[in-house]
């Protein structure tokens, strides 16, 4: 399947801990290199705790902060890319469906041509309930 190079991309990542913390920098770099309109939304309701420092992509200065916010601010600052974060656990299907709903973009400021963004859902969570939620969303979208 081919997509036009100017078609926008939205990546929604659930989980910013052990897996998401290491996936996020690669997603940021990929979106930055693609050179197309992109949105990256990181979702996690957890905070950085001392036990996370040994195995997750956080430093002591991050302690007590929301994991999604830390990653969004760290990499968007470095790469100059606007990023959104949701400092909550996504536990209900309507909330997830709202996040993955493709938005319509105007492709060029002087054109009436519009297109919907491609949406990628990354499940970087460590619990089966959220994995099942992603499965439900996949079949309903």
Put a short name on every predicted segment.
Residues 1-141:
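Adenine nucleotide-associated cytosolic modules
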């Amino acid at each position: 399947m081919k997509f036009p190079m100017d078609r926008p991309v939205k990546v929604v990542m659930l989980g910013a801990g052990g897996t998401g913390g290491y996936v996020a920098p690669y997603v940021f770099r990929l979106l930055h290199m693609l050179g197309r309109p992109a949105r990256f939304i990181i979702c996690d309701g957890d905070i950085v705790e001392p036990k996370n420092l040994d195995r997750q992509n956080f430093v002591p200065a991050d302690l007590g902060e929301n994991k999604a916010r830390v990653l969004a601010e760290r990499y968007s600052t470095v790469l100059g890319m606007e990023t959104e974060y949701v400092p909550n656990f996504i536990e209900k299907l309507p909330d997830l469906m709202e996040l993955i709903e493709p938005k319509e973009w105007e492709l060029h400021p002087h054109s009436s041509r519009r297109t919907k963004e491609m949406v990628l859902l990354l499940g970087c969570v460590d619990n089966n309930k959220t994995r099942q939620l992603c499965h439900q969303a996949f079949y309903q979208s």
